[in-house]
Amino acid sequence: MIELKNVHHHYPDGTRALKDINLNIPKGEFLLICGPNGSGKTTLIRLISGLLKPTAGSVHVNGLDPIHDSKEVRHLVGMVFQDPDSQIVGETVKEDVAFGPENLGLPLTEITERVDWALHVMGLKDLSEKACYLLSGGEKRRLSIAGVLAMRPQVILFDEPFSFLDYPGIQEVLRHMVHLHREGHTILVTTHDVEKVIAQVDRIAIIHGGELKLAGPPKELMMKLPQFGIRPPCYALLGKEKVSWLE
């Protein structure tokens, strides 16, 4: 479904962010993209979403180029940013979730249906008229996900989704991510803190210094994480079976 071939990316000041990335992500996969801060994780998913253009190489989603076929790819791919405040644009919860569908030019009846559905899925129905600035950190995170869901994407990109959240908030967001995966969505999540999500994912891709170092099942790569500045989950260090944060 997603193909990155010989992808390089340099920022305008000449800083190299990614070097020769080759990665195929099948439909329905739950992929963890991990690496230390500044490794290129966010740049990678921004290329997939079409927010950035590769300096060299190609990115395709269902055979479409996120830059040249931006309108079609916006229907396929949704991104949840690290800072939910940067993604919230409406005055109320309902208005914010409606923003995306409205900009697609959808009929009012379909906008209403999508908004109601997204609010229900994310447990925000009772907060639909609440001002966004009054929401807690966890509620803002759920709102940013609801706004993406209202666009009905097949692929959802989560950039450091557990930042700024307490333990109950992390569990809540993780529970929704797992549910979306079970519903058939392709899920990509970036983080330097693998402990919270590694028990749920199908595969890990390790990014270090802008390069894709390894990709494979969590069980195979778990104890190789420290080589790339990533702390393995506690259960792996203790020699135990995987433990989910949802248990």
Regions found by a protein language model. Give the residues of each.
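Conserved ABC ATPase "signature" region
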Residues: T109-L127
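Catalytic Walker B motif of ABC-type/P-loop ATPase nucleotide-binding domains
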Residues: I156-D159
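Helix-to-loop junction immediately C-terminal to a conserved catalytic motif
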Residues: S49
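H-loop/switch region of ABC-family ATPase nucleotide-binding domains
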Residues: T191-H192
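Conserved beta-strand-loop-alpha-helix hinge in the C-terminal portion
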Residues: E211-P232
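Conserved ABC ATPase signature
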Residues: A131-L135, E139
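Conserved ABC transporter NBD signature motif
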Residues: G57-D65, V73
